[in-house]
């Protein structure tokens, strides 16, 4: 299907809605314009005082566009996936954020002749929160242009809501088509200057650590990575700030008395220091910031549309850089801003009835500006990991994107479900939007090595970043040797890993590694059971 004008366009305001059939239409002082150029469809909106909520575009399939053969559909996620990415049949009510792929056949046997995959998407960093719906008669794009849970008041300016593209890829696998489509949607990737990998203390320490323990973690990482082409990172996760999962971010707590000194000591071991931060959180107003800087619906969190908040975020970021940290992992911003985790967001991103401090911008614009403020303050030499960031909005602004919900150092079920799924299904975005971070390998001794070793192995061979959270002193010599080999492989990230049975299995076991098929049996040892979503 080629990119073309929709058959029906509907404007939704706080006062009502109206449908149109042309490239332009107006409701009160609100107007939309659709422009075809260079195989893209630009959707723009303008209004003076009318609060705008949604723009809906509907394409009815012509007989030539309608797929006659059976197809399966892939839909992406707002931010991190929750172990729920999959190819499905036609589900008209399904919400597919950002883009959808529609394909015949299967990737399992790598047959290409007669394959046809269509992509329906928007370019990265749009001005609206966009999702697709696909049914037997057509395809629909919804653009949420609200400001929080109220209509945006543009004040006469023109909003570039989205640049829309349809693409068709023939005689290639669905995975290959997905890779090509992600590259076409991308406004440009911000690739790290070196492969990013190493240690992160979260999945064994869970916030209980210290200056000395981090130095020991860094020493172990340096020893295991000795001789590698690229130096590893040591990411200090939550637990260093005065309040757990909260600021202020201008100093450490009693267990972390000297954050600049800690960064210097990590670097002295030949390891790149990294730090975790939760910018938006200000529970109980511990950061000492003005009351007017907080979200109207929840005063425990900062409002990223406020100029003072953006300045505070820039200052905090510059402080980390001045302290000597070469990697910043910023976390939890989607749930802190919108009130729920990305993989639990249904059709609309925010509940009705509230708005940001600056009501003239859409939620998508406000969140993108928040990411951009961090990027500008971090500079070109600092690696940013966007954790729980909105995928399409952070693309091009961060080097790494955490693409799945948390694995778990204590539960193989959670690790397998969250980790393997996001690695398989978000791999096509790797190198197009950012480097895909499918999360860490948590080594605590609670999960048998037969299982956690599989997760370590596939991540190390994936060509995507490998981070390991390993409790010191629990590995045998043989296991340490495996970890050393995994780090060595991942320190260059030249491998090409492709899921094969991903169209039939949301936890793929068949993979293509550098052109050779390999298998992973994720269920070989029945060490735990998921029943009704809980481990028994």
Q: Where are each of the predicted segments found?
A:
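Short strand-loop junctions, especially beta-strand C-caps/beta-turns
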Residues: 202-204, 239, 446, 471
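Hydrophobic targeting/anchoring helices
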Residues: 156, 162, 456-459, 466
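Carbohydrate-binding surface patches
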Residues: 38-39, 459-463, 467, 500-536
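Carbohydrate-recognition beta-sandwich/jelly-roll modules
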Residues: 2-232, 327
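Glycine-rich, acidic and aromatic/proline-enriched surface loops and short helix-turn segments
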Residues: 220-223, 227, 241, 281-282, ...
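Short coil/turn segments at secondary-structure boundaries
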Residues: 438, 470-475, 498-502
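Catalytic cores of secreted or luminal carbohydrate-active enzymes
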Residues: 458-494
């Amino acid at each position: 299907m080629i990119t073309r004008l929709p058959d029906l366009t509907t404007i939704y305001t706080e006062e009502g809605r109206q449908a149109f059939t042309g490239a332009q239409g107006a409701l009160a002082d609100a107007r939309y314009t659709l422009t075809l150029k260079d195989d893209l469809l630009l959707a723009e909106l303008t209004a003076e005082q009318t609060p705008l909520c949604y723009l809906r575009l509907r394409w009815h399939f012509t007989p030539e566009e309608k797929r006659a053969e059976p197809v399966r559909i892939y839909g992406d996620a707002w931010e991190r996936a929750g172990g729920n990415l999959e190819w499905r049949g036609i589900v008209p009510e399904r919400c597919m954020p950002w883009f959808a792929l529609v394909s015949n056949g299967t990737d399992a046997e790598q047959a290409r002749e007669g394959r046809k995959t269509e992509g329906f998407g928007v370019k990265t960093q749009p001005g609206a929160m966009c999702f697709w719906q696909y049914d037997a008669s057509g395809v629909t794009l919804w653009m949420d242009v609200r400001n929080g849970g109220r209509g945006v008041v543009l004040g006469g300016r023109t909003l570039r809501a989205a640049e829309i593209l349809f693409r068709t890829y023939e005689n290639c696998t669905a995975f290959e088509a997905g890779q090509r489509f992600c590259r076409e949607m991308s406004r440009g990737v911000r690739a790290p200057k070196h492969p990013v990998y190493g240690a992160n203390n979260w999945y064994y320490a869970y916030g209980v650590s210290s200056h000395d323990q981090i130095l020991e973690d860094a020493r172990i990482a340096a020893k295991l990575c000795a001789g590698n082409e690229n130096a590893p990172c040591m990411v200090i996760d939550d637990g260093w700030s005065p309040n757990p999962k909260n600021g202020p971010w201008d100093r450490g707590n009693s267990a972390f008395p000297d954050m600049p000194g800690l960064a210097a000591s990590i670097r002295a071991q030949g390891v790149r220091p990294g730090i975790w931060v939760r910018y938006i959180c200000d529970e109980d107003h511990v950061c000492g910031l003005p009351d007017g800087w907080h979200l109207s619906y929840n005063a425990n969190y900062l409002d990223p549309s406020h100029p003072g908040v953006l300045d505070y975020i820039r200052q905090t970021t510059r402080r980390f850089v001045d302290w000597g940290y070469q990697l910043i992992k910023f976390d939890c911003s989607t749930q802190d801003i919108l009130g729920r985790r990305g993989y639990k967001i249904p059709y609309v991103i925010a509940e009705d009835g509230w708005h940001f401090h600056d009501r003239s911008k859409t939620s998508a614009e406000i969140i993108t500006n928040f990411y951009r403020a961090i990027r500008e303050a971090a500079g070109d030499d600092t690696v940013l990991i966007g954790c729980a960031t909105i995928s399409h909005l952070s693309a091009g602004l961060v080097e790494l994107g955490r693409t799945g919900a948390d694995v778990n150092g204590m539960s193989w079920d959670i690790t397998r479900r969250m980790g393997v799924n996001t690695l398989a299904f978000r791999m096509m975005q790797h190198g197009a939007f950012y480097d895909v971070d499918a999360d860490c390998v948590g080594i605590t001794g609670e999960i048998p090595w037969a299982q956690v070793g599989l997760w370590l192995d596939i991540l190390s061979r994936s060509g995507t970043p490998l981070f390991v959270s390993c409790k010191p002193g629990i590995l045998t010599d043989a296991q340490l040797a495996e970890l050393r080999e995994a780090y060595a492989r991942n320190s260059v990230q030249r491998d090409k890993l492709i899921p094969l049975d991903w169209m039939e299995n949301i936890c793929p076991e068949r993979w293509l590694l550098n052109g050779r098929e390999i298998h992973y049996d994720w269920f070989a040892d029945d060490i735990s059971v998921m029943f009704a979503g809980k481990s028994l």
